[in-house]
Design a protein with these regions (language model features):
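Broad gene-expression machinery/nucleic-acid interaction feature
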Residues: 37, 55-57, 68
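A short macromolecule-binding patch
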Residues: 59-61, 65-74
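Conserved hydrophobic positions within beta-strands
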Residues: 40-42
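Short, well-ordered turn and helix-capping elements at secondary-structure junctions
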Residues: 30, 44-46
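Mixed-charge, Lys/Arg-rich low-complexity intrinsically disordered regions
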Residues: 2-28
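Short, solvent-exposed secondary-structure boundary/capping segments
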Residues: 48-59
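Charge/polar-rich, low-complexity and marginally structured segments
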Residues: 74, 78-184
Length: 184
C-alpha cells in the first residue's frame, strides 16, 4: 500500500552523494546579503531530495533574527542574494548619508511603501537613502511610530552590512553611521 503514496511523502532512504557546486562564488563561512532579511552567513552547502528531485541548497544563518534559511543554489541569483557590497558602494552609501534629505510631499502610506521597497531591495545605497530621509536631528520634531520603525529597520540593515564589511560589531557600526549623519 505504501507504494501508492504520493512521491512527495518523506521516505527513509539514503541520499546519493552529489558534488555540491559553489555557484555565484559563495562558500561556507561567507557573509551574504539576502534582500528581505539582510546580512547572513553561509553555514552549509546541502544536498536534499524534495518532491522527488535533488536540490543543492545554501543554508544561511541570520544571527540577529535567530533564523535559518535554505535557498536553492539555482535560485540564489533570482532572489537577489549577493556578496557584501564593494568598498566603492560602501563609500557611495556613506556619501549618500551626508546628502540633503529628500522631503516628499506624498501621503505617508505611499512613502512608507517606497521606503520598505528600498529596504527590501538589499541595495546598500537605497537603504542609506531611507536612513538619510528619515533621520531626525535633536532639534527636529519627533518621528511617528511607523516612521521610527522604518528608520530603525533601515539603520539596522545598514549597520549589519557595515559591521560585516569592516569586521566590527553592530553597535560600533551604528555609532559610525550616526556620526556621519550628525556631521552632515
Amino acid at each position: 500500500m505504501l507504494s501508492q503514496w504520493p512521491r512527495w511523502v518523506a521516505q527513509d532512504k539514503e541520499l546519493p552523494a552529489m558534488p555540491i557546486a559553489k555557484p555565484l562564488g559563495f562558500e561556507v563561512g561567507d557573509y551574504v546579503v539576502y534582500p528581505k532579511h539582510g546580512v547572513g552567513r553561509v553555514v552549509e552547502l546541502q544536498s536534499s531530495e524534495i518532491a522527488g528531485s535533488f536540490l543543492e541548497l545554501f543554508v544561511l544563518r541570520f544571527e540577529k533574527e535567530r533564523m535559518t534559511l535554505r535557498v536553492p543554489t539555482n535560485k540564489a541569483e533570482a532572489v537577489g542574494m549577493r556578496k557584501l557590497s564593494s568598498q566603492a558602494t560602501l563609500t557611495e552609501a556613506l556619501t549618500t548619508l551626508k546628502g540633503k534629505p529628500r522631503i516628499k510631499r506624498t501621503m505617508w502610506s505611499r512613502r512608507a511603501q517606497e521606503y520598505e521597497a528600498k529596504i527590501n531591495s538589499g541595495d546598500l545605497v537605497s537603504i542609506a537613502e531611507v536612513v538619510r530621509d528619515l533621520h531626525r536631528a535633536e532639534d527636529q520634531p519627533e518621528q511617528s511610530y511607523s516612521e521610527r520603525q522604518i528608520y530603525e529597520a533601515a539603520i539596522g540593515r545598514l549597520a549589519r552590512e557595515l559591521a560585516a564589511m569592516e569586521n566590527i560589531d553592530e553597535p560600533a557600526a551604528q555609532l559610525k553611521i550616526e556620526q556621519v549623519l550628525k556631521a552632515a
